[in-house]
């Protein structure tokens, strides 16, 4: 099977106010003028950083995707304003790019989904726990990752710059256990 290279250019940070949150009304007002609401380009993957009661301040909380709606629309639906330290929430958005000038909508959406799942699998953000369990239990999904590489550029924050299914999935499938004296070959 052919390798699939997914390149992601990250931008941020953005605040909840940047995507239309109004603290006084406790509501979002999504308009075309907002950053991250351009219906031609504001699709891809996003990271949310903020406070977590166990892990502390300014940590990776969540990785999500926006492929059917813009980043601003998608993020406004997730309830980040209810985080007890919502004023310090930071959002980073990743847009896919590649060698091909044009890509089909289906392929774009597929690559967004693959990259999102691979990033969740490798980084295990606290608020993605149900997605992590679904991915690790589904051998078909894990097999799908084997030939994928994700390259992160620019403001990728605490994500690894490069991920590969070769490292995260294929290697573990070939793993035969920890070395011990029980399975040691005798010295000559």
Language-model features: where?
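Boundary/linker segments flanking structured domains
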Residues: 1-61, 67-188
């Amino acid at each position: 099977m052919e390798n699939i290279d997914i390149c992601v250019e990250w931008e941020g940070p953005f605040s909840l106010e940047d995507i239309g949150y109004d603290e006084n009304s406790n509501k979002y007002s999504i308009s075309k003028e907002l950053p991250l609401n351009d219906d031609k380009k504001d699709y891809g993957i996003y990271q949310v950083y903020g406070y977590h009661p166990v892990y502390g301040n300014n940590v990776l909380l969540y990785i999500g995707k926006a492929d059917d709606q813009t980043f601003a629309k998608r993020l406004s639906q997730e309830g980040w304003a209810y985080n007890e330290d919502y004023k310090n929430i930071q959002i980073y958005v990743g847009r896919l790019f590649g060698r091909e000038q044009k890509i089909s909508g289906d392929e774009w959406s597929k690559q967004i989904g693959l990259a999102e799942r691979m990033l969740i699998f490798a980084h295990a953000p606290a608020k993605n726990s149900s997605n992590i369990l679904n991915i690790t239990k589904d051998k078909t999904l894990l097999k799908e990752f084997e030939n994928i590489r994700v390259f992160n550029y620019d403001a990728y924050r605490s994500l690894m710059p490069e991920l590969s299914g070769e490292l995260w999935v294929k290697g573990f499938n070939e793993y035969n256990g920890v070395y011990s004296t029980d399975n040691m070959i005798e010295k000559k």
